[in-house]
Regions:
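Histidine-rich, glycine-flanked metal-binding segment
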Residues: 1-17, 32
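Metallo-beta-lactamase
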Residues: 17-26
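Divalent-metal coordination cores built from histidine and acidic residues
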Residues: 31-145
Length: 174
């Protein structure tokens, strides 16, 4: 194949795109999918999902995006997000919206727990854990990287070791 152009990169630094391994850009991407502040720094991939993801909604998790901080630019996503009953639905919505960076995500442990028991502070029951295992398996099938808990924040902090191990056993099958 013939070279079409030669670019002089003398005195320049050439590198692949950077990966933000703990991105909190879910809301900023809803406001402006170009994510200019990250792209101009060379960040081309964002990994999300620490403790929370906007999907799936269902079961005891009523969903609902918080619009108080971002206001109107996020409100246009509120109705749409009510239908995100699978983890893949919000990733597909970002893709359809044409967000600039590559996106990868864990299922937020708090979101997972809310699907089974909302903000209940009690240990999970067998039935609730079965719900969490099912939702976790669906998320893995939908492309989740795994599960991520932030054990200092509710409802993640209410999960005991046995519950977390139970969920991680599902992740381990994928």
């Amino acid at each position: 194949e013939q070279v079409r152009a030669v670019v002089d990169v003398a005195d320049a630094v050439i590198c692949p795109g950077f990966i933000d391994i703990q991105s909190h850009s879910i809301y900023p991407l809803m406001v402006d999918g170009r994510c200019v502040s990250k792209i101009t720094q060379g960040i081309t991939t964002e990994i999300m999902g620490e403790a929370w993801t906007p999907a799936p909604v269902g079961g005891r998790n009523p969903g609902g995006l918080l619009t108080s901080v971002y206001g109107e630019p996020v409100e246009r996503w509120v109705e749409r997000s009510r239908g995100w009953t699978r983890f893949a639905h919000w990733l597909e919505a970002f893709e359809e919206a044409g967000v600039s960076p590559n996106i990868g995500s864990y299922l937020g442990g708090g979101t997972l727990r809310r699907c089974a028991m909302d903000m209940d502070m009690n240990p999970s029951s067998g039935k609730q854990r079965a719900t969490m295992r099912r939702v976790m398996a669906e998320a893995m099938e939908d492309g989740a990287f795994g599960v991520s808990y932030a054990l200092i924040y509710p409802p993640d902090c209410y999960a005991d070791v046995d519950e977390i191990v139970d969920v991680c056993e599902v992740v381990g099958r994928y």
